[in-house]
Amino acid sequence: MSVKRIKNLVKQLNEYRHAYYNQDAPLVSDAEYDRLFDELKELEEQTGFILSNSPTQTVGYYPVSELAKVTHPIPLLSLEKTKLISELLDFMKGQEVLFMLKLDGLTTKLIYEDGRLIQASTRGDGEVGEDITHNIPAFLNVPLTIPHKERLVITGESFIPTNDFERLKDTLRDGNGKPYKNGRNFASGSVRSLDPKNCIGRCVRFLPFNVLEGMEDVPFPDSRACKLEGLTHLGFGYCPFFSCLLYTSPSPRDS
């Protein structure tokens, strides 16, 4: 019975993932998807039965649009999830942790060489994404040139602010001809458009949340916080955050 349930969940979740990642038309809420995903993960741990196409084994659905594919030498992995305070505290113990706002958009990677933007791409499945360089000029806040000659690779979120989404959502349609349900899918449809004209005027913004390569000249090059703050000198903003270092882990009651 558990194996049959696993197969059904894998089929169901992959259908949801396809609609979300490749059609910009979600079929269920994030909360419902997370509930089914957590059920699948628990059943897999209980039974030891994991299908090769299980969504627990991949970051995202493989892109199937006409955009050129981009391989990520450093995989763009997603974060682990937890609903338990105790698990979060155990993870934090003995290391600096950055707490960031979760932006509702599309993970994007920018590559700069000799002070110029040479490529922008989506995360895709974490290992292979899509080239969206042609749409970057339509973004509101991405520098095309920066005062930094060394190679720089940063990741962040491409998104549309809520007030702009509310203002624009009734005037545009998704790939299925329906109104966009949320800002994330509106941003994804805009960023992954084949024609840059479709991205212009949609108020797409980018905020970095990590430096994958470069910024080794900052005072503390091993500190993500220090590198993010260093980006401000190059004309970037960054996703708001605060850092915390926990040496001992208390035992709070999970709620």
Question: At which residue positions do the language-model features occur?
Answer:
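Covalent nucleotidyltransferase
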Residues: 111-112, 116-239
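Hydrophobic pocket-lining residues within nucleotide cofactor-binding pockets
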Residues: 103, 211, 252
